[in-house]
């Protein structure tokens, strides 16, 4: 359907699941990170640009990306870093709910600088980097793992 037809219930549910959940995780994680640590969230290009059929999830991802920045600022003095990974589309359970998903995959293969889609392992390796000391100076970032598609959008 159209974004303008989003129900209040649907809007709030998307915000709760996709954005506010990070706030709760960060609050609880801080309790077990007395010496600092790292928190990583996943997002999607639809939080930065309007993506056909992504609708309320795009608004929720935009909220999540702002949440990452505010949590990075808030938890930085505790040596807790907060970052996001904006992953290219992967075949997941949630992807099944996105209309035209195969068309999106094809467009990335044709237009992204690397001319291919990314896989879950590439996203996982980026998360490992963000969770490791190799990224000790990185916080409040949204790293794109999408074969460069975000750069040409």
Range-by-range predicted roles:
Residues 112-123, 134:
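A conserved structural motif in NAD(P)-dependent oxidoreductases
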Residues 2, 14, 38-64, 68-77, ...:
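Catalytic loop of short-chain dehydrogenase/reductase
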Residues 31-32, 73-77, 136:
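Alpha-helical segment proximal to the catalytic Tyr-Lys
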Residues 26-27, 69:
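A short, exposed helix-loop element centered on a Lys and neighboring polar residues
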Residues 77, 87-112, 152-153:
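A glycine/serine/threonine-rich, flexible loop-to-helix segment
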Residues 128, 139-153:
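Short C-terminal tail/terminal secondary-structure segment
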Residues 1-12, 31, 53-56, 96-100:
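Conserved mid-core segment of classical short-chain dehydrogenase/reductases
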């Amino acid at each position: 359907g159209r974004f303008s037809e989003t129900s209040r219930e649907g809007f709030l549910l998307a915000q709760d699941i996709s954005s506010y959940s990070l706030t709760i995780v960060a609050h609880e994680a801080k309790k077990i990170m007395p010496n600092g640590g790292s928190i990583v969230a996943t997002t999607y290009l639809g939080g930065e640009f309007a993506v056909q059929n992504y609708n309320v999830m795009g608004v929720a991802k935009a909220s999540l990306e702002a949440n990452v920045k505010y949590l990075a600022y808030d938890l930085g003095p505790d040596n807790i870093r907060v970052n996001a990974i904006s992953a290219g589309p992967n075949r997941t359970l949630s992807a099944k709910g996105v209309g035209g998903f195969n068309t999106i995959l094809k467009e990335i293969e044709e237009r992204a600088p690397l001319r291919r889609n990314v896989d879950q392992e590439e996203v996982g390796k980026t998360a490992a980097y963000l969770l490791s000391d190799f990224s000790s100076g990185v916080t409040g970032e949204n790293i794109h793992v999408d074969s460069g598609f975000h750069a040409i959008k």
